[in-house]
Amino acid sequence: MRKIRDIIYTILLILVILLVYRNIDTISEFFTDLLVSNEKVTIKEANNFKRKYNYVNFNYNINYIPYTKDDIINIYFNVLNNGWKEFAFYCPKEYKTCMDDVETVGNDNTLMSNINNYVSPFNSFENIKTTISSTREIKINVTPKYDDEMIKVLDNKVNKVITELNVQELSNREKIEKVHDYILSNTVYDSESDNLDTTSAYGSLILGHAVCSGYSDAMALFLDKFNIPNLKISSANHVWNLVYLDNNWLHLDLTLLGMT
């Protein structure tokens, strides 16, 4: 009798194993749903350098639950624009290719660089890393281009220069001209230095030496203070500013004059 019972148990065990094997994806998805259902996206306050310009390329009003690749791109934009150093969201069950699309977007260096050009220099990244979990959790970790001390020093410098230039009552065009002349008068174009700060506004406004990205970051900080819509344009070896002035987008390249 015991032998028969053992045989039955063995047969049942084999049947259970076969059932699990044949339905492993469904079972895995079930437990994944249990884990994800208990998770909520945490939305923190944006920092003081969030841009609120109405860029047509990106959507500010999102709920951080993606259903398309464009939704994923907008999440990356808002994470950077808000100045968040880390953020987690989840791929919904209905969006079957979500994790693949996240991987595609997160690994697209050209796209990430383009998004970087639309946010304040203070919210731009030096490095951005995406981690994809089997529970459909997506983590974004941002290493900022500017640390907190550099931001403090530069923000104080920009405020001081604005006061010294006495531009409060000037038109936007006149403000830009004043800042343009100030940066060119106080920055030397330096492509020979090994100092990485030459690629930043710190190099231009504090050290007095910069390359194109340093010039453009410096100008962008002033434009943001004046609430003048702007972004950066970048190619493989050059960066300059694009400024919205008098209902037109205008190119502003300080480096061309800085090099002369």
Stretch-by-stretch model annotation:
Residues 149, 207-210, 232:
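Alpha-helix capping and helix-loop boundary segments enriched in small/acidic/polar residues
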